[in-house]
Structures are given as C-alpha cells and as structure tokens.
Amino acid sequence: MPEVERTDRPPAVKNSRQEFWTQGLRRSGAPYLSALFSTVVVAQFAQYLWPTAIVLKGQPAGVVVQFVGFGIAVVLWWLYRPTDSRPRAFAWLVGAWASLWVVTVGLSVLHGDLFNLTAILVLPSLAMIWLKKPSLPAMFIAGDSFALALVLVAIASQLLDFAGIKELHYEGWNRWPLLTDITGPIGRWEGPFGNVNYAGPIGAFLVVWGLLRSGWRRALFVLAGAVIILVSDSRTSMLSCAVGVAVLIAVAPRLGAFRTPLLLRVAAPVAVALAFFGYVLVIDPTLNLRTPVWEVFLSQWRTSPVSGVGASGIQSAIDAGTLQSWANHGHNLLIDPLMRYGLLGVVALIAVIIVSGVIATKAARLGVAASAVLLATCLADGISEDLVDWRYLGVQAVPLLLAGLLGAAWLTQARREKT
C-alpha cells in the first residue's frame, strides 16, 4: 500500500522558527553586545537592592549578576558569525582601553587597593568586541538596550519606593524653583545609581542618545533623561547635556527634516561655552567647592607623581583632615586619576580620549554625528566629576566606550561602501 503523505506542518514550522532565531543570532552582533551593556545596569540595580547580601561563594548580588550576564553574552558571542574584517580603528580603540585597564589594575595592586572580581571581565569583554566586531546597526541596538535598561531600573526603583519595599536615598535639597514650587522642598534624587552626581549624567546621556534616535525611542529617552536631570539637580549633567546638544547642532548638517544653518552650527557651541564661563566667573567660581579639592589632589599627587598614591592615599588624606570625607574622589576626569594612578594612569586615560576623539572626528566628517556627540557629552561630565572607575566596565564607562565603537564601526562601513 502506498505511503500517504502527511499534511500537518507543526514540526516544519518549529524548525523554521528555530532556524530563524539561530540565523539571526549568527548574523547580528547586537544580542551579545546588548547583553554586555545591559548586564552592567542590571548588576548595578541588584547591588542597589541587596547592598550587603552575600549571594554565592562570598560574593554580593551585583558581582554574581555581572558574571551571569557575561556568561550569557559569551554564548551569544559564540553564535555570532561576523562577515566584516577587524579594522585598524577598532584595534587602536580596544588596545587603548585594554592598556588603561592594565595600568589602573596594576597600580591598584601596587597600592594595595581593593577591587571586586568583575574587574577581570573587562579584558575578555574587549577581546569579544575585537574578535567579532558588531556592525553599526547592531551597536545602535546595543545602545538602545543599554538606555532602555537605565530607564527601566530608574522606574523600578521609584515604584519600589512608592510601595515601601526599598526606600530611595536623597542627597541634599533640590534647588530647582520650577520643581519645588509645585512639590515643596524635596531631596535630590539619586535613584539606584548611588549618587546624584552619577544619576544626573545618566540623565544627560539619555537625552543626548534619544536625540540621536527616532520615533518612540527618542520620545522615551529624552523624556526620561530630562526628568532625571531635573530631579537629581546635577549642574554637571545640565552642562554635559547642553554640550552634547550643541555638538549635535554643530556637526550635523541636518536635524531630521530641518537643514542646520551655518550660523546656528557656529552659534550653538559658542553660546554654551560663554554661558559656562559666565556662570563660573559670576555665580560659582569654585564650581561648588571643586577647586579646593583639586588643589589638595594636585598637592598630594606631587608626593608620588609617577604612580600616584592610590585609594589608600586618598583615604589617608581624609583621615589626616587634609580632605573632607565627601571628597573621596577628585571631581575631575583627569585630576582624580592623577592623584590615584599618577602620570602612568593619566597618560593611559588620555590615550583613550585621543583615540576616541580621532575616530569621532573622522566619523563626523563622513556624516555621522553620534560618536562625536556622545564623546563630547562624556568629556563635559568630566569637568567637575570623575564618573568612571577605569578598572570596570560599569554604567559610567559604557557611554564613553560606545562613543568610540560607533565611530569605528561607521569608518569601517564607509570604507567598505567605497570599495
């Protein structure tokens, strides 16, 4: 008797779905890069929720989450099959970041400073990006994932506070009349990020990133970032946001359907610069007591100019009364590592900035402003804050790394399109 052909198709449908997802993971670097970037946000949130809880083998929640997320990223990275070559721009960028990590971790060991186990994930993460470079669209997707994770944990922390499950911390009083006239006196919001001076620049990143995107992403990220800037009342974030917007206007020939006039492209950064210097000269010449801290840090750096004094040296200055207890970091992108890691650390950091700057400039000349805008925003943050612990791939480090990666990816794509 002849065989009757089966007409039901579920197995084939299932197999086609599996093939679709498998092929998608093989063709795009977005999944693994999104996992790398989003994990640092989730780890930060876990540490906020359970700051003293020991979860596994003596390790706190944030460390455990970081390793789990890294493991997921490794699996996704293994499935990815890139078709692009590894361009020179990526080599310089990844090499500069790796050198900075080696210097800062090595000097931390020399000084006897403590650091957690997630520091060892930085070099493997950089190697993953170097060995299997994501495409430019994949990097934008990863940036969206990172930004969305920031928004979600900010909302979650506020909901937990409303529910009485996890009380938010506030630092000082908010100085925005526009806000306090409506709500009455309220504290400066730090959310799950540990400090208002960390929360504010995260808001600035969200605003700038949102302006670089479109549709619902633009609306969500700009709105969320603006709210965070307002409630955290961080002057640094206001400056960095203004700088990012000014650079976007200056380097982008078009803003959506609007063609940017040359006069506006020149006037925007000039106006921000004049406003900043006017504010410093007339209203706040000490940058909210930053300049006295800088003087002490520079004085202490001279005791060990090459390798710095480390975190232990900063704590010794606090114990001796030379520094106040709140000044446990240098409140400047270069002054803090100068005292902490000496000339070795600062030179390594400047190398990262220079390489990222060259890449961003070349990308801007070829028509993509994202790299230059993000880099300018991050550097403006560093005028009165040092947001990044260079031994980790943390929440504050990702925007700066992303700035360089976007530019390097665009240079690769532009070169490929020319050939």
Model regions and ranges:
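Transmembrane alpha-helical segments and their membrane-water interfaces
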Residues: 75-80, 104-159, 352, 380
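A membrane-periplasm/extracellular boundary helix in multi-pass inner-membrane enzymes
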Residues: 2, 156-164, 249-288, 298-302
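Transmembrane alpha-helices of multi-pass inner-membrane enzymes
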Residues: 372-379, 387-419
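Hydrophobic transmembrane alpha-helices and their immediate junctions
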Residues: 3, 14, 259, 343-379, ...
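Alpha-helical transmembrane segments of multi-pass inner-membrane proteins
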Residues: 141-172, 177-185, 191-233, 238-251
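Interfacial transmembrane-helix termini
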Residues: 45-68, 83-90, 99-123, 137-138, ...
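Long extracytoplasmic/lumenal interhelical loops at the membrane interface
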Residues: 281-341, 356, 360-363
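N-terminal signal-anchor transmembrane segment
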Residues: 2-81, 97-108, 333, 377-384
